[in-house]
Amino acid sequence: MKGDESAVADFTGRFARNPKSGISDEPESARVVMSKRRLVVAGEERITVPLSDVVDVIVGNVPPDVRDLFDATITIGHRTDDGTVETLLIEGGEETISKFQAVLFKCLLNGTKARVKHPARVGGRVTDEPVRNAKLSITPERVGITTADGKFAIDITDVIAFERIDRGIGGGEGPTLLVRHATGGQATVSLVSPLSNRRLNLLGRFLRVEYGKLLREVADIDLGEPEKQLLVAVYATGGDIDFTGVLDGDAARATNVLNSLREKGLIEEGASGVSLTPQGQVVVNQRIEDVNI
């Protein structure tokens, strides 16, 4: 295969077509091959799905009656020739599905044309930034946006919340994705309106998958006020700070709080000092949102 038909994913797994509650047949073994243009699942039959027909991607959500039959999964919704939507559930090892998910979203979303307004709002202030034409690029860590004036990115770890709004920007028709994210300690709003509704839905699903993963990792972490203060201090200073000064000069207390944050996986130490982990960044973002409300 050449060009867009070169394989970007190739693995052996299992699959089920249109799995539904009440159906408990064993999934079928298959080879899964994907290029930048199409997905092929080759088992007893060969299923070919053009990526331009993919309308939804769901990671890990399996109907209850077949849940015990699968491990790590990804479900792909796609339109058929008669206009109906079918689903294809693919199973593989956890690492394999994680890599496949990342490549799939890149193939589906890279090069997406969109109108963007960035930033549309900083804190409570509406900006006068113009709406620009842009192209999107995707990695598991961020959404990259390229305009005629330059490039910027929205890191997943900076996301506070996002929602679909049913109006367009820059004279275009809706809908639009409104993304609230942290920038320099302030809650910022950016508006992204892909020219294709299908791409907008997939972009929303991508954010839901990646941001949801981080939210689940911090959902059960309980923090006291001293821990929150130190996390914000690390964020604000990049870790270059006398931590005892944050907690009324109590060195022993500061050490205990730092150790607690480290054990909870919210900070890490490297050659350049203390820094936030992705999970720590999410916790700080939520606090920034609370302050800006």
Q: Model-predicted segments: where are they?
A:
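Non-transmembrane, membrane-adjacent beta-strand/coil modules in membrane-associated proteins
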Residues: 23-27, 56-86, 161-189
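Phosphoinositide-dependent membrane-docking surfaces
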Residues: 39, 48-63, 143, 151-168
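Long, low-complexity, charged/polar intrinsically disordered regions in eukaryotic proteins
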Residues: 156-219
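Short amphipathic alpha-helical interface segments
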Residues: 215-247
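Short amphipathic alpha-helical interaction segments
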Residues: 248-263, 269-271
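Short, amphipathic alpha-helical interaction segments positioned at domain boundaries
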Residues: 281-293
